[in-house]
Amino acid sequence: MTDNVQDEIKNIVDQNDVVLFMKGTKGQPQCGFSNAVVNTLSFMNVDYKDVNILESDELRQGIKDFTNWPTIPQLYIKGEFIGGCDIILDMHKSGELASVFDTKGITHD
């Protein structure tokens, strides 16, 4: 991963409270896993930045290298990598995701 892509990813994560690196956009997810996380965040009424990793091969590989996590989507809250689809869905079902949002001061339903 080039330093430019790593810096770009770090800036996005640092400058936004909640970021979802995903395939597609929140208005038009391009895979079922991204769609599931979008639906979860929408259900919780969380404001977040979506980043379409399909726009660039370098970004698509770069985000995987950035976290050393092989799959997309990837959710960040206040600069902390939280996880991918299965983790987010499990955290939502258990109430842990709401607790993380509360702890980090993120507004949600």
Where are the predicted features?
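Flexible, polar/low-complexity N-terminal or interdomain linker segments that lie immediately upstream
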Residues: M1-K10
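TIR-domain catalytic/interaction hotspot
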Residues: D7, R60-D65
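Acidic beta-strand-to-loop metal/phosphate-binding motif
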Residues: F21, Q74-K78
